Amino acid sequence: MLIDGKPTAKRVSAPLGCDESAYFIKRERLDSLKKKWRVQRGRAKRNGTYDWSLEELLNTREARRRGAPVPDLVGYGYSRSKLGLVQDFFLITRLLTGHVDGFKKVRNAPDSLERVIRASFELLHTLHSLGITHMDLWAANVMLPEQGSAQAIDMENCFFTPTDYLAETLGFQFGFFYFREIYRYVTEAAYDAQVAQALVRYFPDVDRDSFARVYEIAKHEEIGRMKRREIFQNGAIASRWD
């Protein structure tokens, strides 16, 4: 069992194994004393971020409060070690029955690529319109129904405040979407054309030079969580080749 059993990995996620339920559960094993103490006390790290468990809980709750297209938050829980500290953290959301993630859809049906890209860009815009910046929005974090609008998952790396560097932030988001596996299924030129159309439609006033500076790097280089934070907060990015 995902809840009762000993996890085989640090993070495990799966539909809850119950015929009567339609829930999805994530379990994280807290692997250090500092992390257990922070989560138990609800404290942030020195850099201002929370551990994954709390980040996703807080962000999912706030996204739902704003009416964002994300799964319903059902609840959360934890187990304790013999010392009384939090050992495992559980997050339970509504299972998106009838949905498939965008990466799986493209992998199984490459001719669906254009639809996946369009739906993902529309979702990105919807989140921005609600003041939500999802900094890990790749195809597998876009859940697509047979009919209707997409939903976003994995909300742990999000911002809910305005940025002074919207162009740079968008440059990362669009570039990252290409870098994280989509490049395998579309030429860079074709993807660039779809991004250009999306900018005209959704973000016509964005500064194109500032956008392009980050976009060209994000398409080809891995950018970690803290560097993404720098982009959002300061518009700062440097290529590894600089």
Q: What do these predicted regions represent?
A:
Residues 151-242:
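C-lobe/activation-segment region of protein kinase-like
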